[in-house]
């Protein structure tokens, strides 16, 4: 599961389930394992283990800060499936292999610890597991320390009230004045060669989600700097935040550049066509995918396009249209003859180039023949660990290797982003894949839950995408995994994940099962279940490409 791992797990849960497990008091009884869906075979049987009693808590780790409001889960192993276990006096389910997981009320704030007692006949093992809670700030309201009577300074008449409102408006007007640009900055250092792999990230708030992806060398007005972020202006109606280190100050007397979209043209390009938009200095932009078009929003730009020249051999672009949305915002809409398959954005000779990728030729009898598929075994770095110590990165490499074999048997060439236990940076995995011109990217992961979620409510299978053109692949792979694994169908989810942000190919991330659940962790150790996971993904990839010509 990629970082940040827990936000995605919450997304996958039905809203009612989240609400139910957030406020309800958990029952001390044992929750049943989920029933398999459809006609898929059940999970493999859990092997019997009967070793020495040894209590090992995997989660939460010792002295971890637990953020749940009133209840949480705890899991690990005790060495024997024949033993019983209580945690703070509550019976916990012990699985045949000695794994345990239970969901119970949080320990009291003054004694934040779990007391675990494992018993098998005359043998007993005990452990104390200490956790911590977040330090909560105590907000002191003025009303809590002010006298009960109304202070004389508060307005008491209608005239006083109006005067106070005018003062607030004047204060707000002064604040808006202070938001005028204080200078110009360049976002990163531009590259002489075409480089689509380096981007500067724009966020709606400091520390927020990734939304805009700017080309290094883009020049924008600076509004201010705070807490490691630079606030920049895209146009009069939109300000965003970038890392302060990415905003390089330019000379104070630098004149503002005029950015005007001139006549555009469409030309043939490797693996597709280019839409060329002459603009001058680099500008911030945003690309939106629609059903059969791509819309490029250009910030701080005026449109003055008279002619669009179309490549004589182009079969992808139908029309190119432009509008002036606001005095400082232009939009260029590229209407296509089919749904987008992939694209890149880069700068060339002071022009923004939108490179559209053509679809591969598909043999309906052998849809994967001649295609290159990137298989990305998730982690390390990071990753979850199951109750008996199965590390996510170990399991995903085994499953990914099986997936490679199956795809190759069906005619594909496979690019593995890793083949060993060595860590590969998240950002490098899409770069490998883009440079290899893969036709699809599939990242294999195992899921987990955030603090406070009842792990027995909806433990199943989910698939994630970020770019709109990746959604059909996500749906087909989700169908394939659910059919093979037989777990609860958690559906297809949009999520802003690093490895699926690539635009040149469809990219998805699979969460086939939950490694933190004892029965699913045990299944993930078996060759049978590993093969089912891999085969479900392969079936989905094959079905996606079989249906690609009709999309």
Residue ranges and their predicted role:
Residues 1-13:
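Bacterial N-terminal signal peptides that target proteins for export
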Residues 22-33, 50-69, 75-78, 89, ...:
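Signal-peptide-cleaved, periplasmic/extracellular N-terminal interaction regions immediately downstream
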Residues 95-101:
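Short, solvent-exposed loop/turn segments in extracellular or other extracytoplasmic domains
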Residues 355-440, 450-453, 457-459:
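Active-site histidine-acidic residue metal-binding/catalytic motifs
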Residues 379-382, 419-424, 446-451, 468-471, ...:
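Solvent-exposed loop/turn segments at secondary-structure junctions
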Residues 440-443, 448-450, 462-465, 491-551:
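Active-site-adjacent mobile loop/cap segments within catalytic or ligand-binding domains
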């Amino acid at each position: 599961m990629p970082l940040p791992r827990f936000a995605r797990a919450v997304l996958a849960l039905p809203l009612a389930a989240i609400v139910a497990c957030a406020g309800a008091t958990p029952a001390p009884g044992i929750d049943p394992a989920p029933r398999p869906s459809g006609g898929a075979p059940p999970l493999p049987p859990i092997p019997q283990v009967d070793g020495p009693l040894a209590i090992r808590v995997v989660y939460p780790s010792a002295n971890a800060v637990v953020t749940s409001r009133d209840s949480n889960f705890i899991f690990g192993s005790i060495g024997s499936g024949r033993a019983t276990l209580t945690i703070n006096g509550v019976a916990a389910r012990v699985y045949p292999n000695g794994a345990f997981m239970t969901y119970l009320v949080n320990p009291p704030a003054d004694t934040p610890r779990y007391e675990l007692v494992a018993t098998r006949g005359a043998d007993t093992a005990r452990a104390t597991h200490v956790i911590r809670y977040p330090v909560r700030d105590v907000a002191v309201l003025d009303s809590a320390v002010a006298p009960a009577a109304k202070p004389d300074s508060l307005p008491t008449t209608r005239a006083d009230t109006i005067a106070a409102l005018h003062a607030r408006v004047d204060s707000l007007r002064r604040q808006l004045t202070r938001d005028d640009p204080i200078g110009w900055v360049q976002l990163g250092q531009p590259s002489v060669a075409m480089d689509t792999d380096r981007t500067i990230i724009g966020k709606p708030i400091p520390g927020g989600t990734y939304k805009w992806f700017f080309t290094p060398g883009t020049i924008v007005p600076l509004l201010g700097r705070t807490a490691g972020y630079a606030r920049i202006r895209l146009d009069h109606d939109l300000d965003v935040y970038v890392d302060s280190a990415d905003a390089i100050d330019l000379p104070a007397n630098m004149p503002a550049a005029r950015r005007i979209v001139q006549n555009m043209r469409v030309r043939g390009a490797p693996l597709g066509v280019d839409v060329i938009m002459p603009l001058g200095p680099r500008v911030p932009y945003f690309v939106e995918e629609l059903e059969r078009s791509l819309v490029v929003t250009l910030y701080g730009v005026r449109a003055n396009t008279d002619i669009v020249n179309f490549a004589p051999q182009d079969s992808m672009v139908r029309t190119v249209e432009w509008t002036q949305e606001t005095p400082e915002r232009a939009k260029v809409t590229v209407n296509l003859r089919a749904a987008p398959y992939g694209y890149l954005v880069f700068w060339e000779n002071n022009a923004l180039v939108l490179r559209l990728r053509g679809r591969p030729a598909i043999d309906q009898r052998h849809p994967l023949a001649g295609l290159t598929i990137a298989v990305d075994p998730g982690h390390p770095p990071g990753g979850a660990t199951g109750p008996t110590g199965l590390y996510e990165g170990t399991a995903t490499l085994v499953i990914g290797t099986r997936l490679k074999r199956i795809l190759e048997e069906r005619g594909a060439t496979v690019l593995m982003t890793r083949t060993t236990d060595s860590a590969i940076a998240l950002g490098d995995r899409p770069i490998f894949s883009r440079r290899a011109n893969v036709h699809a990217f599939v990242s294999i992961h195992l899921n987990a839950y955030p603090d406070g979620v009842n792990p027995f409510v909806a433990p199943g299978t989910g698939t994630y995408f970020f770019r709109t053109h990746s959604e059909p692949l996500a749906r087909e792979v989700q169908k394939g995994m659910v059919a093979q694994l037989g777990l609860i169908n958690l559906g297809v989810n949009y999520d802003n994940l690093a490895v699926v942000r690539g635009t040149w190919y469809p990219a998805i991330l699979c969460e086939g099962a939950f490694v933190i659940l004892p029965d699913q962790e045990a299944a993930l150790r078996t060759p049978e279940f590993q093969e089912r996971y891999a085969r479900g993904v392969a079936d989905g990839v094959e079905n996606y490409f079989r249906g690609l010509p009709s999309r």
